[in-house]
């Protein structure tokens, strides 16, 4: 039975994580690491309270009121993070109603992959996750807090916040989202405009107009990429107030949900983060990822998060869970609908309700919504509403309101989850199958090897790629150049696919959570910088990518005995040299110390 199989997966993870999990918990709850404001010197305490309202200084300084940290990713350029501007004031005001207070302990950086996509700044993107984790730790290192709020939404921000928060797992913690922007132009129309521009059918001004109709307001992008997959995972891990992920920023309900976050932390009922996040909650996040067709980036981030609390998750677990969990949602790029339409027809509450009903979720996982009378994931089968200005929760719908977007377990879009692990003589890689049509899931074609994204785009522009081929792009892994997303290739590969050509991508780099219809074997491990087999591929090699059978192979008899393609010898020799420009040289030590994609691509030495 599926439930038994999930239990077996959990037991395997628990067994392999026994020593690392025990060590993590021992360190986190060591008496030396607990909040110590009452034992600080008077001068130290005065520094804590100096900027606070006068009437709060003595109560907080003498620990007669709870004092919570706010770690915020606010900036006012990025649409998803602009709404966080007023959250600290909302939280502080609500906490004072409950004899508590909060301070903004730290800001963390928040960069947008949508801005740097295809440009050199993207090489900082993955490492920004680890910088965010470090920045979170700096903010909490004053060690005077009783708990913490984490304000963040987008791609590397939420994983970075959670990795940092788990270093302070003795604190009760709540994650607070901002929600998606209201719907603009349909995502498929935006994608078509990009392809039309790539083919020279529309000009730059026409494309810009379409893009601005898509990205037009505050909130996250409305497609189901990494940012919105983050929000899903926070729900499935029980770190959000229930079903707060996909409420638009300017909806009056959003303010009330922020206030509810403050109430939950002030209640004293929220467990320390280290006790709340365990094998069950991590597996629940993975189950949610598969059931909704979420972002490939979480084959990195969820592993890094798990290892940060002593849980050893690996790609085999992703494969095993994918075999058990049906695909219940079709949200762009997996379908044409956006997350607002997904929310309107039942949303995460319906997905969780369905999975629980069929025994496909760990119901007894701890959450921030746990109370003495109601514990576990059942709290997340309810949807928030405003009635007379008050927050009320009602049971999720029993039936999807649009089965083109959301379906029950009994009638899924597919029997298996949205992500798979490919294996073969190139190593192991990740593919997102939920957005790929059946007729494109197997590609057998000759390789064209590229040194850079720019070379690919130039050759496409010159009409040199109008044929069946597998694009091979090595040295895009974490040790090579920080593992940038290669989403800019999607438009061009998609255009070639629409012209009737059989095309695919093989790379040790990443793709955006928005990437979809072209079969792409990504995160290939070992990567090129570790002399992975990808560096042996030559132009003209016959490659077979078979997503239905989880296989990726070079079909050349001499392949296993080959050396490195001479095209890349100079690249290998220069790997330890810093890349200059846009601050990339400052990240050289992170790049040289990063572990593998299968280990989460972490750069600060967590060895779990």
Feature map (PLM): residue ranges:
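Acidic/charged coordination and interface sites in well-structured regions
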Residues: 86
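Contiguous domain-boundary segments centered on the initiation and propagation of an alpha-helix
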Residues: 129-136, 143-147, 457-468
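A short, small-residue-rich loop immediately preceding and capping a beta-strand
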Residues: 136, 140-161, 174-176
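Catalytic or ion-coupling anion/metal-binding cores of large enzyme and transporter domains
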Residues: 1-76, 80, 89-108, 119-121, ...
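N-terminal small/polar loop signature for handling phosphorylated ligands or for N-terminal nucleophile
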Residues: 105-143
């Amino acid at each position: 039975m599926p439930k038994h199989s999930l239990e077996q997966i959990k037991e395997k993870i628990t067994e392999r994580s026994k020593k690392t999990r025990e060590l993590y918990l021992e360190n986190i709850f060591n008496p030396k690491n607990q909040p110590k404001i009452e034992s600080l010197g008077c001068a130290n305490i005065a520094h804590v309270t100096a900027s606070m309202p006068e009437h709060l200084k003595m109560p907080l300084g003498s620990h007669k009121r709870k004092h919570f940290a706010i770690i915020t990713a606010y900036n006012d350029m990025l649409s998803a993070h602009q709404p966080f501007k007023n959250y600290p004031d909302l939280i502080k005001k609500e906490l004072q109603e409950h004899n508590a207070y909060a301070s903004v302990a730290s800001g963390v950086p928040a960069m947008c992959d949508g801005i740097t996509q295809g440009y050199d700044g993207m090489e900082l993107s993955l490492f920004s996750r680890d910088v965010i984790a470090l920045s979170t730790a700096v903010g909490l290192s004053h060690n005077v807090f009783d708990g913490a709020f984490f304000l963040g939404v987008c791609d590397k921000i939420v994983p970075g916040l959670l990795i940092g928060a788990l270093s302070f797992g003795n604190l009760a913690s709540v994650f607070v989202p901002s929600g998606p922007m209201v719907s603009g132009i349909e995502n498929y129309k935006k994608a078509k405009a990009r392809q039309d521009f790539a083919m020279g059918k529309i000009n730059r001004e026409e494309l810009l107009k379409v893009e601005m109709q898509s990205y037009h307001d505050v909130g996250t992008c409305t497609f189901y990429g990494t940012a919105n997959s983050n929000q899903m995972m926070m729900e499935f891990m029980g770190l959000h107030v229930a079903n707060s992920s996909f409420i638009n920023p300017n909806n009056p309900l959003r303010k009330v949900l922020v206030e509810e976050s403050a109430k939950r932390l002030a209640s004293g009922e929220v467990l320390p983060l280290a006790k709340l996040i365990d094998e069950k909650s991590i597996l629940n996040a993975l189950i949610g990822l598969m059931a909704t067709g979420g972002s490939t980036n979480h084959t990195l981030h969820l592993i890094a998060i798990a290892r940060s609390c002593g849980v050893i998750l690996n790609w085999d677990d992703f494969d095993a869970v994918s075999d058990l969990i049906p695909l219940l949602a079709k949200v762009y790029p997996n379908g044409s609908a956006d997350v607002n339409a997904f929310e309107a027809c039942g949303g995460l509450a319906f997905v969780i309700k369905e999975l629980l009903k069929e025994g496909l979720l760990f119901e007894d996982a701890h959450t921030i919504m746990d109370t003495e009378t109601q514990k576990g994931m059942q709290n997340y089968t309810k949807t928030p509403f405003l009635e007379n200005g008050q927050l009320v929760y009602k049971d999720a719908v029993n039936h999807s309101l649009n089965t083109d977007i959301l379906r029950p377990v009994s009638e899924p879009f597919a029997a298996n989850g949205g992500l798979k692990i490919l294996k073969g003589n190139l190593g192991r890689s990740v593919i997102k199958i939920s957005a790929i049509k059946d007729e494109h899931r197997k590609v057998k074609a000759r390789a064209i090897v590229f040194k850079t994204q720019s070379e690919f785009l130039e050759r496409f522009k010159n009409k040199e790629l109008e044929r069946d081929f597998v694009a091979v792009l090595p040295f895009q892994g974490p040790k090579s150049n920080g593992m940038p997303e290669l989403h800019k290739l999607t438009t061009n590969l998609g255009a070639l696919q629409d012209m009737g050509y059989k095309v695919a991508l093989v790379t040790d780099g990443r793709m955006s959570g928005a990437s979809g219809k072209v079969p792409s074997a990504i995160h290939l491990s070992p990567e090129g910088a570790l002399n992975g087999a990808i560096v042996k591929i030559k132009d003209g090699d016959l490659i077979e990518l078979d997503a239905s059978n989880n296989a990726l192979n070079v079909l050349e008899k001499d392949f296993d005995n080959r050396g490195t393609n001479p095209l890349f010898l100079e690249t290998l020799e220069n790997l330890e040299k810093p890349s200059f420009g846009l601050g990339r040289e400052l990240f050289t030590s992170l790049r040289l110390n990063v572990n593998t994609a299968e280990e989460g691509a972490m750069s600060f030495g967590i060895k779990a």
